[in-house]
């Protein structure tokens, strides 16, 4: 079978088709069940993190090494020639000449797309500002499939910061290809952006806006939590808004036994720690799944057949 992801840049989730996503999920399932330490043998991957990261950077590095590859790079753009004024384009040209692929996180929206225009090797976006985070979406899709046995026709709620949360933008776009039904629950000031809602309307995808989790809880298959970002509000306004979007054990009353809670992490106060002990909590397993999803993507991008 032809591998459509071979040597492909992965900058936005919209760069991937539904079959591409299904291929990554299936490959992640296989690698989780049957580890393969040879898929990146003799491959060298650059890990270029111009912005702070814990899970994304470490899971990519783990993924490369578990597949038998090698990784070089940096975790702080302040320690690179960017501090001397070197352009991103020049940096990526050089880094791409050393390696077989570049994984990059950058605080500026559009930086990953720019990097792909100057790189002779595939660029994988590890997050660019509040724009896109496609590999988070792939691990989210893998986690949803792991818990629900499918991706099609699910009821999915997004809670918290839907305006600036790049993970919810990417995931909503991806799941729209699987005819899911969406429930958006957020402060009015942090509502899902118009462009996402317009895309969903054009595709005929059902979605609705709600003030509380409780009113839709019995319908949900997936509850996707995000944090309300404190830095975007004054103290009084933040406390009022954040308190409305805290998930507690009592909030889960009436939930389907199979409903799972996801969160891109880090968690602050939006999920009470008591929820961790419920059968609905899946966010720590979700983070672990990041290794398998990123293994799958790297293997597909760097091998003609997998």
UniProtKB/Swiss-Prot annotation:
Entry keywords, A to Z: Pyrimidine biosynthesis, Transferase
Pathway(s) per entry: Pyrimidine metabolism; UMP biosynthesis via de novo pathway; (S)-dihydroorotate from bicarbonate: step 2/3
GO terms, biological process: 'de novo' pyrimidine nucleobase biosynthetic process; 'de novo' UMP biosynthetic process; amino acid metabolic process
Keyword Transferase part of the UniProt annotation: yes
Residues annotated as binding L-aspartate: 84, 166, 227
Signal peptide segment: none
Molecular function terms, GO-annotated: amino acid binding; aspartate carbamoyltransferase activity
EC number: 2.1.3.2
Top-level lineage group: Bacteria
Reactions catalysed according to its record: carbamoyl phosphate + L-aspartate = N-carbamoyl-L-aspartate + phosphate + H(+)
Alphabetized NCBIfam families for the sequence: asp_carb_tr, PRK00856.1
Function, in words: Catalyzes the condensation of carbamoyl phosphate and aspartate to form carbamoyl aspartate and inorganic phosphate, the committed step in the de novo pyrimidine nucleotide biosynthesis pathway.
Assembly behavior: Heterododecamer (2C3:3R2) of six catalytic PyrB chains organized as two trimers (C3), and six regulatory PyrI chains organized as three dimers (R2).
Protein's recorded name: Aspartate carbamoyltransferase catalytic subunit
Origin species: Aeromonas hydrophila subsp. hydrophila (strain ATCC 7966 / DSM 30187 / BCRC 13018 / CCUG 14551 / JCM 1027 / KCTC 2358 / NCIMB 9240 / NCTC 8049)
Gene: pyrB
């Amino acid at each position: 079978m032809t591998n459509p992801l071979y040597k492909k840049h992965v900058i936005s989730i919209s760069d991937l088709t539904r079959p591409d996503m299904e291929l990554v999920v299936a490959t992640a399932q296989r690698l989780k069940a049957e580890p393969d330490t040879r898929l990146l043998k003799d491959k060298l991957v650059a890990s270029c993190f111009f912005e702070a990261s814990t899970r994304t950077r470490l899971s990519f590095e783990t993924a490369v090494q578990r597949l038998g590859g090698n990784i070089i790079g940096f975790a702080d753009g302040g320690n690179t020639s960017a501090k001397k004024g070197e352009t991103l384009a020049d940096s990526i040209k050089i880094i791409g000449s050393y390696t077989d692929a570049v994984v990059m996180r950058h605080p500026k929206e559009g930086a990953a797309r720019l990097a792909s225009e100057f790189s002779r090797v595939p660029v994988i976006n590890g997050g660019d500002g509040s724009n896109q985070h496609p590999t988070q979406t792939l691990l989210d899709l893998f986690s949803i499939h792991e818990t629900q046995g499918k991706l099609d026709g699910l009821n999915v709620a997004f809670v918290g910061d839907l305006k600036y949360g790049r993970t919810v933008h990417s995931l909503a776009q991806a799941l729209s290809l699987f005819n899911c039904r969406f429930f958006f629950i957020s402060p009015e000031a942090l509502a899902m952006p118009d462009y996402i809602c317009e895309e969903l309307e054009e595709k005929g995808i059902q979605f609705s806006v709600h003030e509380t989790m409780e009113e839709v809880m019995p319908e949900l298959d997936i509850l996707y939590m995000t944090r309300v970002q404190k830095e975007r509000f004054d103290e009084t306004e933040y406390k009022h808004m954040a308190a409305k979007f805290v998930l507690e054990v009592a909030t889960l009353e009436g939930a389907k036994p199979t409903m799972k809670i996801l969160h891109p992490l880090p968690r602050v106060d939006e999920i009470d720690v008591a929820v961790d002990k419920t059968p609905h909590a899946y966010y720590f397993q979700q983070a672990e799944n990041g290794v398998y999803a990123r293994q799958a993507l790297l293997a597909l991008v760097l091998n003609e057949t997998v």
